[in-house]
A protein has these predicted regions:
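Leucine-rich repeat
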Residues: 2-11, 18, 22-218
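Plant-skewed but cross-kingdom recognition/interaction modules and surfaces
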Residues: 169, 174-285, 305, 338
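Intrinsically disordered, low-complexity repeat segments enriched in small/polar residues
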Residues: 14-17, 243, 326
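Generic short beta-strand segments
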Residues: 159-160, 230-231, 329-330
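Extended repeat-based solenoid scaffolds, especially LRR ectodomains
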Residues: 272-340
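Eukaryotic short linear interaction motifs
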Residues: 49, 109, 137, 163, ...
């Protein structure tokens, strides 16, 4: 039986498919560098670097991508991770780093981590995301970070005291997210928020105010404020992922008894709270707020009565609301005032 015809047809189809693939690849290779680098920016840093083996055309493209994202995995690969970050920063064009994310264990390598931060700050980074954990020594972030003129978005997530330098001024910062940061005194908190003159969006997630009596949040451009106080809740129910970091600031937990948070929001449009009302919240000059969402977690009966007064105090400072969203837990807490 003659099978040459089907085989020839299959070979032709395979050849044609290969030709089409080569044509598509050439078309991609002929795209301008900025477009290819933009495409690479959607990949993880590791995958973007792996494209360097495709051809000579791709060999150095990754060195100019504007976004770098480093996420450390298991501790047994730490040395490999540290060397990888060092090598990438050494080979990358520093003038093109606009977005830098770092998620890693600190351990005893604060000097390395600070040098990486200084490197991207020096070259005018615009978006900086830091997720730091597992501290085995005290960390003081480099002073240059707190006067970075190019920075527009900053995320700082770490279960550690925030040590501020004498000068704090973010002239371009519009979005600030603080996660599980420990503030050690009134002065440092005031210094940080006053150093953000054009801040528009502020998120404070499970932060601890150690030895802080009053927190004053005042920014003339602030439009959206989100506060979460779930830390004590997650500790109670064993949902905290940062328990290993507690040793770094063991005394900080014991000094946390709540504080008064005063919010001056002349441009504030939206406020959202989620968690346990362990602090007092007061609004001043905040007639611009139109959207408020409150989700309060129920505690014991004595705390619920106190929380009910705090909800009432919070809402009494808001006079121009168009939308108010409250959770079932918030309603239950407020009902304590009616019962008593």
């Amino acid at each position: 039986m003659d099978v040459s015809f089907p085989l020839d047809k299959a070979k032709k189809q395979k050849f044609r498919k290969k030709q089409n693939a080569n044509k598509s690849r050439k078309e991609i290779d002929n795209l301008p560098d900025p477009i290819l680098q933009h495409i690479l920016s959607y990949l993880s840093t590791k995958n973007a670097i792996q494209t360097s083996i495709l051809s000579k055309r791709w060999k150095y493209l990754w060195t100019s991508i504007p976004k770098l994202d480093f996420d450390e995995g298991a501790l047994d690969r730490r040395l490999m991770f540290m060397k990888f970050v060092e090598r990438v920063l050494a080979l990358h064009d520093p003038s093109n780093i606009k977005n830098f994310s770092l998620s890693c264990n600190v351990q005893y390598d604060t000097s390395h981590i600070n040098s990486w931060i200084c490197s991207v700050v020096k070259h005018k980074v615009q978006v900086l995301n830091l997720y730091l954990r597992n501290f085995q020594e005290l960390l003081a972030l480099p002073p240059c970070l707190f006067t970075c003129e190019s920075l527009e978005v900053l995320t700082l997530h770490m279960f550690h005291s925030l040590k501020l330098p004498s000068s704090v001024f973010f002239s371009s910062l519009k979005i600030l997210t603080l996660g599980k940061v420990i503030f050690s005194d009134d002065h440092s908190t005031q210094q940080l928020f006053m150093g953000c003159p054009i801040l528009e969006n502020l998120s404070i997630v499970d932060c601890i105010w150690k030895n802080v009596k009053t927190v004053c949040i005042s920014s003339p451009m602030l439009q959206r404020l989100f506060i979460s106080d779930r830390y004590l809740f997650t500790e109670k129910y064993g949902e905290n992922d940062d328990k290993d970091d507690l040793n770094a600031d063991a005394d900080d937990q014991n000094d946390f008894n709540g504080c008064q948070v005063v919010i001056f929001g002349t441009s504030l449009k939206s406020f959202s709270f989620d968690g346990e009302l362990i602090n007092d919240y007061c609004f001043y000059n905040s007639s611009s707020i139109v959207d408020v969402s409150i989700q309060v977690f129920e505690r014991n009966e004595l705390d619920c009565y106190q929380d009910a007064h705090r909800v009432y105090k919070l809402l009494s400072g808001l006079s121009s609301l168009e939308k108010l969203t409250v959770s079932n837990g918030t309603v239950e807490v407020c009902s304590q005032l009616l019962i008593t």
